Amino acid sequence: MGKKIMVVDDEPDTVDLVKLVLETEGFEVMTAFSGAECLKKLALEKPDAVLMDIMMPEMDGWELFKKIREKYKDLPLAMLTVRNRDIDKMLGLHVLKADDYITKPFGRKDLVERVKKMVKV
């Protein structure tokens, strides 16, 4: 069984695409469509890494990131977002210390390589 990745995004098409790409590469994929759903699932089962969108209703990715990091300090976390401004990348990578910052649209090969690097495959 491959490494387990949690994908959190409020857009079902994005979740389905990322899930398909990662499962094709042998990863097991957990999904959540909101920050609250992600936190509930994390309490039951811990993945090897989490990929999360930034722009989500109710709890955005920045807030979700902080909540996950508080409780699961060593869990690799990456932002998966359309927000490609330098200020967003700086906040994600250097202020919050995300393990990666992946912008949409992303290439299949690039996504897989970056996830493998995060989980050390």
Predicted regions and their residues:
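Conserved phosphotransfer cores of two-component systems
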Residues: 43-45, 68-74, 96
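Active-site beta3 strand of CheY-like receiver
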Residues: 45-51
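Receiver (REC) domain active-site loop signature in two-component systems and cognate sites
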Residues: 56
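Two-component/phosphorelay signaling modules centered on CheY-like receiver
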Residues: 12-30
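Acidic catalytic/metal-coordinating carboxylates
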Residues: 34-37, 60-64
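C-terminal output helix
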Residues: 105-116
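Alpha4 helix (beta4-alpha4-beta5 surface) of REC/receiver domains from two-component response regulators
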Residues: 63, 84-100, 113
